[in-house]
Amino acid sequence: MSEVLEAHGKDPVAIGITNQRETIVAWNKKTSLPVHRALVWQDRRTSKRCLDLQKTDLLPFIRTTTGLVLDPYFSATKIEWLINEGEIALSPDVAFGTIDSWILWNLTNGSAFATDPTNASRTMLFDIERMKWDERLLNVFGITEENLPAVLPSSGQFGITSTSHSFAAGIPITGIAGDQQASLFGHAAFAAGDAKNTYGTGSFILMNVGQECPEPVDGLLSTVAWTIDNDGEISTTYALEGSIFVTGAAVQWLRDGLKIIDKVSDLEKLALECETTDDVYFVPAFTGLGSPWW
């Protein structure tokens, strides 16, 4: 960041953070050092735990409260795994956060421990209608609220940069949003019915559904698109999302794993040479399918 700012020649007026969403970092608040490797959004090590929970009465509660399905993709079982299998002893000094919280903590030298609803809504711990951490879900997964970040509006005051960085201190951090919601906003999808689809590692289609929390739709996720703080008046916009875990990553696998192509553009030539698939299809379910099958 310092190299980019130095080349620009001016300090920014404000900083915004966008990030991959469900990835979880655990760190010590006193030392600001991680206490375990991050568990990324594609990590499926808690699959059995999720299958066990699906046999309980928790499934409909999670669906209606968080807007999500019970899947290892989301952060709750990752945090639970870090506590139980990663042997992280809970204390007031332990912090769990998505990547935005970790970046914010470091940019402010530990003075700000916060997130926004677009990230909180991906943890499977957050009530997307009441806009708060859900006590029942915290108890189920053995997590205490003091170990989680405060949830602030997506556009608002999160803190200021500290003197511990090589660029100027005192730059306000005024926005946080998960990457897919930031993409929806960046494409000016401001009206209900507006949608975007991102093709990257996976593919993620989000549609703005307005300011009413949507009822669950089979195969899709209900999520927070963004919250806006307009001089103390908080407005929330919701979205429906379809998440496909592996699309572009499959092309990367063909290149780097199977090595059947040297560069991505070679794939088009191979595809055009094939007159028929003979009913053979490739389903890139390397980390599960995502929508609509889960």
Question: How does the language model describe each region?
Answer:
Residues 20, 153-160, 180-183:
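Short acidic loop-to-helix transition motifs that present clustered carboxylates
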Residues 47, 54-66, 72-113, 119, ...:
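Active-site core segments that coordinate phosphate-bearing ligands/cofactors
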Residues 148-157, 268-272:
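Short linear loop/turn motifs
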